[in-house]
């Protein structure tokens, strides 16, 4: 059986007036995962933008916050230092090398999994959801977990971000599939089960 398409996701869930209320759905952890074939990455990204356009139309009036977790990590690194050097600058210097030095890999892993980075995303989300607007604000959509791998996994992000998800619904787009109680990034790499998040399209 084919999995739910993005268009069906909109028709069956996102445009549903009851689901558009932050207090409905999974009340304990209002986080949802949409799985897709990683080969469809750029098509999915285009469709995510289309979702935002459809949700802001008069029949919904919803202003959706969409974030690329990889792009947000790069922005976060702009102000981060490794000694006297900008971490982002060090990465740029090593762009032409076949293999990134282990010291930089370790720093990137630690930064991506840091409380500071999770707070950085939370601050951006709070700014959006608390800013006065005539539009409803219900959804935070996150994608880019294929790009930020191996430094941050979707399961790690969700476990650490759970305490921040209040007053809105978090939707994570996952480039892989769910099978045997576990998520598989790119259909290959094991990612832990995120028990408290709801899989939208099993």
Residue ranges and their predicted role:
Residues 2-59, 64:
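Glycine-rich P-loop/Walker A and Walker A-like loops and their local beta1-loop-alpha1 context
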Residues 17, 116-133:
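A short, acidic, amphipathic alpha-helical segment used as a generic capping/interface helix at domain edges
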Residues 30-33, 137-141, 169-171:
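Residue-level preference for the first positions of well-ordered beta-strands
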Residues 39-43, 72-74, 111-116, 146-151, ...:
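Short acidic, S/G/P-rich loop/turn micro-motifs used as interaction or catalytic elements
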Residues 42-49, 75-80, 150-156, 181-185:
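A short acidic (Asp/Glu
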Residues 65-115:
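Long, charge-dense
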Residues 134-151:
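Conserved P-loop NTPase "ATPase switch" module shared by AAA+ and STAND
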Residues 149-202:
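Glycine-rich, aromatic-bearing surface loops/beta-hairpins
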């Amino acid at each position: 059986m084919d999995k739910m398409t993005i268009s069906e996701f909109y028709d069956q869930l996102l445009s549903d007036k009851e689901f558009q209320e932050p207090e409905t759905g999974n009340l304990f952890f209002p986080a949802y995962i949409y799985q897709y074939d990683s080969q469809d990455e750029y098509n999915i990204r285009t469709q995510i933008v289309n979702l935002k356009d459809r949700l802001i139309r008069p029949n919904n009036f919803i202003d959706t916050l969409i974030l690329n977790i990889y792009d947000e990590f790069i922005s976060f690194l702009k102000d981060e230092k490794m000694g006297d050097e900008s971490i982002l600058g060090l990465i740029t210097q090593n762009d032409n090398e076949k293999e990134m030095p282990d010291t930089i890999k370790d720093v990137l892993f630690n930064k991506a999994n840091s409380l500071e980075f999770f707070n950085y995303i939370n601050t951006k989300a709070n700014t959006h959801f608390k800013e006065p607007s005539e539009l409803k604000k219900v959804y935070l959509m996150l994608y880019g977990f294929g790009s930020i791998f191996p430094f941050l996994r979707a399961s790690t992000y969700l476990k650490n971000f759970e305490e921040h998800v209040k007053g809105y619904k978090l939707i994570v787009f996952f480039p892989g599939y769910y099978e045997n109680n576990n998520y598989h990034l790119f259909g290959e790499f094991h990612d832990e089960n995120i028990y408290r998040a709801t899989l939208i399209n099993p």
